[in-house]
A protein has these predicted regions:
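Adenosine-phosphate binding glycine-rich loop
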Residues: 117, 122-170, 262-346
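Phosphate-coordination loops involved in phosphoryl transfer and adenosine-cofactor binding
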Residues: 4, 88, 178-181, 254
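Short glycine-/small-residue-rich Rossmann-like dinucleotide-binding loops
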Residues: 78-79, 95-96, 232-237, 261-262, ...
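An N-terminal-biased, well-structured beta-alpha scaffold segment characteristic
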Residues: 3-110
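Rossmann-like adenosine-cofactor binding region
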Residues: 211-290
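Glycine-rich phosphate/diphosphate-binding loop of Rossmann-like nucleotide-binding domains
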Residues: 11-42, 47, 156-233
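General beta-strand structural signal in soluble alpha/beta enzymes
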Residues: 9, 38-41, 60-61, 75-76, ...
Length: 346
């Protein structure tokens, strides 16, 4: 399989997406193994295209993957552009198409039309179902940081990507004020651990809920916190953590929700009163005027706020698996999941 494998790293069409699935240092390691790597130029990617050229990558124009030979495997992170209507290549990215998300069926139909294959990175898992490459830690870190800053009235917009050191310096100033009561739901997974780390930098010791606490949610206890960070990975519909009626509870202290999971268009949404994302230009949305007022943060590419750190960690996880793309058991599981979902979508 290695002899036939050719990787093509595409430009991300989302203007705020500065991450890379493969960083230059890891591209070099694959090239040294005899795997050709093409990288599209990208005006916003955090790693300059010259860094890829310096390690032996072939450089291509942004969006030129659509004309790439069939044997190229197209690797990205977020959504594809709307064209072409028929997808003929093997694609590796986060498709967000299997849990009833908006646009999921349309994406799968594009693969049906072109005969291509989606290797969805969310479903690149080991035999126990644990994801092998994920941005969760950095999503949690960014989501926790934004929640703290908004609670203190220090979240400015539009959001700008930053280095972790700069963000940490801003968070550290939070230690000068009285710490809010913060709750992390799903505190012990990747996202939750990242949120815990961000809050620790701000001098906040959160309440941490795991599986046991979320089997039967104590909503009164949840509403007694100032900040809620939702970091739970849900794959099947379940009773929500909060409902619209709960937001009107006269005893509610909750004033900031950071929805890191951000399953806003899915039946798996554990915060169903929120059905749309917020954005870098408008990171918060008022859910109710209160008293007290309640705002939500629901940004679906949080790790892009820390693009360098997030990319380096993700690439280190993904690179060993890219070397066996399509042939190893984790990729075979991805393929089987794709064909199962393709059949379900009709």
């Amino acid at each position: 399989m290695t002899e036939a494998l050719r990787l093509w790293i595409r430009h991300e069409v989302r203007a705020t997406e500065r991450r890379a699935p493969l960083v230059p240092a890891d591209a070099r390691l694959l090239i040294e193994r005899g795997i050709p790597v093409t990288v599209e130029d990208s005006p916003q990617r955090v790693f300059p295209i010259a860094d890829y050229a310096a390690v032996g990558c072939r450089i291509a124009e942004p969006g030129s993957w659509v004309d790439a030979p069939d044997e190229e495997c197209i690797v990205g992170l977020k959504e594809l552009p709307d064209a072409p209507a028929a997808l003929r290549h093997r694609h590796v990215f986060f498709g967000h198409a299997y849990k009833g998300q908006r646009g999921g069926r349309q994406l799968l139909r594009r693969f049906t039309a072109g005969g291509g294959t989606l290797f969805d990175l969310e479903y690149l898992v080991d035999g126990r179902g644990h994801r092998l490459a994920a941005f969760g830690y950095w999503a949690g870190y960014a989501g926790g940081a934004l929640a703290v800053l908004h609670h203190q009235g220090r979240l400015s917009s539009p959001l700008q990507p930053a280095a972790k050191e700069a963000l940490d310096a801003v968070l550290a100033r939070s230690r000068r004020v009285v710490a809010p009561r913060a709750l992390i739901v799903g505190a012990f997974g990747r996202c939750g651990r990242g949120a815990q780390a961000a809050l620790a930098t701000a001098g906040i010791t959160p309440t941490c809920w795991g599986l046991e606490e979320t089997e039967t949610v104590d909503r009164a206890a949840l509403l007694a916190h100032d900040i809620l960070i939702n970091a739970v990975l849900v794959t099947e519909p379940a009773p929500p953590f909060l409902t619209s009626a709960d937001l009107q509870d006269p005893d509610r202290q909750l004033i900031v929700i950071s929805d890191v999971t951000c399953d806003v268009t899915s039946p798996c949404n554990m915060l169903p009163f929120n059905n749309r994302t917020t954005s870098w230009s408008a990171p918060t949305r008022r859910l109710c005027d209160g008293p007290p007022p309640l705002d939500i943060i629901a940004i679906d590419n949080l790790p892009a706020l820390l693009p360098r750190e997030a990319s380096i960690a993700f690439s280190a996880d993904l690179r060993p698996h890219l070397a066996s793309l399509g042939s190893s058991e984790p990729w075979q599981r991805c393929r089987r999941t794709f064909h199962r979902e393709l059949a379900r979508a009709g």
